[in-house]
């Protein structure tokens, strides 16, 4: 631990492990079970507690509070953890809780994530890589978020919901059901309004791949027969498209929540 990089007003408990080039700014508090890897910077007034690991080059801004106990009535003081990946930007007033013994025991946030002001990650969440939380975006307990997801400002995700990779959640959206990979969901009670086409283009999807994805979306949600029959039809075609394969795998995996659908009366998204 390089003492020269710790502001004299900061408090770093005995037992904390800090890499040599970590910077701990004014009035930060670091608990005894915290690990700060290479290049981590706590700017000022940051609180890091619990069994918490912050990955290399992650930066944490003033008044963020990480690794505090889960907000669960079932928590009885068990030693659970928080793991944050590399190269994350954790902005002002962000909160992240550790896991619960009755859940995963750990809350995980992936690499290269940005959590804007006052975002919240609750106990036992699993967040993938390259995820962006806009201001005040909130995850309830046990939520799973795939890679490259964008959560709009003031959005709220109900506990145990799964959000697939590449999803866009609109601002001020309440998500109570699982959202398919590449989906775009908005509304006070979120409904699908199509695919996250802008995100797919940014990820290099070709015109033919976008056409196939839109066709599969229409077939699943607007086709003939029951939902189970339409899903079975896609299952037979899943080797033809990475999108279809990801879609079928997500639905087949299931979860504790229902699947988010388009609202009634919505017209299928056209090419």
Swiss-Prot record:
EC number: 2.3.1.129
Entry keyword annotation includes Transcription: no
Pathway connected to this protein: Glycolipid biosynthesis; lipid IV(A) biosynthesis; lipid IV(A) from (3R)-3-hydroxytetradecanoyl-[acyl-carrier-protein] and UDP-N-acetyl-alpha-D-glucosamine: step 1/6
Keywords: Acyltransferase, Cytoplasm, Lipid A biosynthesis, Lipid biosynthesis, Lipid metabolism, Repeat, Transferase
Main localization of the protein described in the UniProt heading: cytoplasm
Molecular function (Gene Ontology), one example: acyl-[acyl-carrier-protein]-UDP-N-acetylglucosamine O-acyltransferase activity
Keyword Cytoplasm found: yes
The protein's enzyme class: transferase
Cellular component GO terms, alphabetical: cytoplasm; membrane
Reactions catalysed according to its record: a (3R)-hydroxyacyl-[ACP] + UDP-N-acetyl-alpha-D-glucosamine = a UDP-3-O-[(3R)-3-hydroxyacyl]-N-acetyl-alpha-D-glucosamine + holo-[ACP]
Listed CDD domains: LbH_UDP-GlcNAc_AT
Biological processes per GO annotation: lipid A biosynthetic process
Compartments where located: Cytoplasm
Subunit structure: Homotrimer.
Name of the protein in question: Acyl-[acyl-carrier-protein]--UDP-N-acetylglucosamine O-acyltransferase
Organism: Azorhizobium caulinodans (strain ATCC 43989 / DSM 5975 / JCM 20966 / LMG 6465 / NBRC 14845 / NCIMB 13405 / ORS 571)
Gene name as annotated: lpxA
